[in-house]
């Protein structure tokens, strides 16, 4: 069978237009990519970098495995410098840090913080700090506070590996001991303990928190405003028991996994209930944990903070000053709040006497192997992050935890 052959025609004249169109398209795509990168410079990558090197876990005479903490650090307008200082004070290569300045903060504050994290050599090497670029709108006393916390938890569950406890702090917080102290003592604890102050004896809060119905405009508006109150009141719930306490918590990964994924409907049901609850961060996690049989026996009734209140208590705790320093130390708590925005004297004393930290530097620990005799930052030269050197402050934390876990205190104060 004879095949048909089509006559050859020279189509080389088509190459030039095709080449021109390709160049124009490529130029457009590159410019579009550049524009997107520029316009979304504050967008989070939602990923922690892998360290450029790794060290094996310690095995010094069969010592217990060191835990990892996942910190959420929050702030608002004007808090950028204080958030940076807090990050430096609690930084440790083993941990993870998620930093969030809410929508009230300026883009320049957020950019300055992200720029610092990106440029800091130690953080760059260990890749364990992330700044949220797309900020959440947070309304004081509203459920958007819980939403922001759950947002942070979800990111940490997705992107950070092998952490044991979640700690939420704000720009008003500061540590009273080094991370080496905390990591060392917590290495001896069961990994299923959840630290949160809680009680079902809500007293005056029944009529000022539980029965009123509030609406948080931050759920559906893009500009910040206060909550507003409905005329109607509601009765106390019958299908679950209310618990309230401090919004500052140290919670396990397994419990927070349950809160986010909720393989039964309790976390979602309570989240919907607390949408109309004033100061919901003071009750959401507490009510979830104490109404579920798998977690109600894991609670330790303490928020691991030193907080001083007026008598009778006011809406906010007292501002801590130098006169409270000795009480802070004796408390054995790893954290304290709240500190004045315009007076650093108490923080400076904590830095000098408890953290051995110089201004603008990280709190030194076993991972810092540089010399400090010449005034240089010892953490500029870093070694094995699994080498911890606890200070005398660890003994105070140990004493506090022994008291909290004593048979006479532990079970009798769980979800009561």
Regions found by a protein language model. Name each.
Residues 2-416:
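ER/Golgi luminal nucleotide-sugar-dependent glycosyltransferases, focusing on the catalytic module
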């Amino acid at each position: 069978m004879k095949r048909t052959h089509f006559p050859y025609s020279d189509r080389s004249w088509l190459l030039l237009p095709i080449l021109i169109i390709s160049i124009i398209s490529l130029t457009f795509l590159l410019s579009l990519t550049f524009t997107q990168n520029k316009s979304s410079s504050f967008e989070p990558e939602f990923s922690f970098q892998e360290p450029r090197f790794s060290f094996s876990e310690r095995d010094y005479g069969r010592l217990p495995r060191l835990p990892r903490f996942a910190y959420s650090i929050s702030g608002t307008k004007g808090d950028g410098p204080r958030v940076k200082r807090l990050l430096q004070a609690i930084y440790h290569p083993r941990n993870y840090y998620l930093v969030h300045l809410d929508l009230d903060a300026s883009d320049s504050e957020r950019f300055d913080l992200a720029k610092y994290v990106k440029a800091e050599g130690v953080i760059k090497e260990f890749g364990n700090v992330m700044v949220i670029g797309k900020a959440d709108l947070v309304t004081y006393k509203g459920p958007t506070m819980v939403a922001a916390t759950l947002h942070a938890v979800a990111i940490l569950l997705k992107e950070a590996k092998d952490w044991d406890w979640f700690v939420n702090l704000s720009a008003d917080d500061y540590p009273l001991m080094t991370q080496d102290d905390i990591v060392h003592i917590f290495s001896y604890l069961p990994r299923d303990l959840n630290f949160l102050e809680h009680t079902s004896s809500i007293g005056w809060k029944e009529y000022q928190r539980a029965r009123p119905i509030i609406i948080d405009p931050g759920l559906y508006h893009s500009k910040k405003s206060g909550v507003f109150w409905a005329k109607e009141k509601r009765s106390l719930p019958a299908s679950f028991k209310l618990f309230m306490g401090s919004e500052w918590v140290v919670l396990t990964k397994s419990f927070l996994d349950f809160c986010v994924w909720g393989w039964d409907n309790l976390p979602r049901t309570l989240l919907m209930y607390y949408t109309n609850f004033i100061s919901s961060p003071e009750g959401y996690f507490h009510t979830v944990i104490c109404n579920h049989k798998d977690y109600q026996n894991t609670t330790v009734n303490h928020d691991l903070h030193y907080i001083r209140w007026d008598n009778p208590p006011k809406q906010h705790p007292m501002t801590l000053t130098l006169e409270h320093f000795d009480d802070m130390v004796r408390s054995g708590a790893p954290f304290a709040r709240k500190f004045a925005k315009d007076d650093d004297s108490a923080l400076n004393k904590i830095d000098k006497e408890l953290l051995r930290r110089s201004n603008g530097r990280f709190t030194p620990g076993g991972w810092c192997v540089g010399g400090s005799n010449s005034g240089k930052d010892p953490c500029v030269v870093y070694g094995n992050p699994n080498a911890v050197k606890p200070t005398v402050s660890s003994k105070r934390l140990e004493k506090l935890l022994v008291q909290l876990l004593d048979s006479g205190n532990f079970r009798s104060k769980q979800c009561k």
